[in-house]
């Protein structure tokens, strides 16, 4: 939903170049334009949108007379099913991970969830055993037609996190 102006400012390119990029993007991925039009129409008709799991969000802004407010409602209608489904998925993963931590006798514990990211405190001697469980739990939280992949990092603090590849996990 970024405008040519917004893209030109962020990428430090001329607006015409930004618009050409946007046009090429939507021509290449035409399903995105279809989705955006369809979800806005559905939201206008029903007054709400839903996540894949059926959680609803009412969008009264779509009926606003103010065009700026109405445009904000359209952005909500486009983004909520995607972002809301991601939130649903991470919450499912959190519940299942907690169950697996308890069942496995782990001392590890979840500390924080930010968007689609989980931060855990894990004793060093549990890292190798927990990584495959964490990966499988998060990647299988909701079966979809596209694979969910997880990036796992380890470290003593956020500043020193090191990515852990699948090969690292297999070798452990």
Residue ranges and their predicted role:
Residues 1-172:
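Conserved catalytic core of nucleotide polymerization and phosphodiester-bond processing enzymes
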């Amino acid at each position: 939903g970024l405008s040519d102006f917004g893209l030109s400012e962020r990428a430090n390119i001329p607006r015409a170049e930004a618009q050409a990029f946007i046009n090429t993007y939507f021509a290449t991925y035409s399903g995105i334009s279809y989705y955006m039009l369809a979800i806005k129409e559905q939201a206008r008709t029903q007054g709400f949108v839903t996540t894949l799991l059926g959680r609803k969000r009412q969008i009264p802004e779509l009926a606003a007379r103010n065009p700026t407010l109405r445009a904000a409602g359209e952005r909500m209608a486009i983004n909520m099913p995607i972002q809301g489904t991601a939130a649903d998925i991470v919450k499912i993963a959190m519940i299942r991970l907690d169950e697996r931590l308890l069942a496995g006798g782990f001392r590890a514990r979840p500390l924080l969830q930010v968007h689609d990211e989980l931060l855990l405190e894990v004793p060093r001697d549990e890292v190798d055993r927990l990584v495959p469980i964490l990966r499988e739990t998060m990647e299988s939280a909701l079966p979809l037609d596209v694979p969910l992949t997880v990036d796992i990092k380890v470290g003593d603090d956020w500043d020193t996190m090191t990515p852990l590849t699948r090969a690292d996990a297999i070798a452990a």
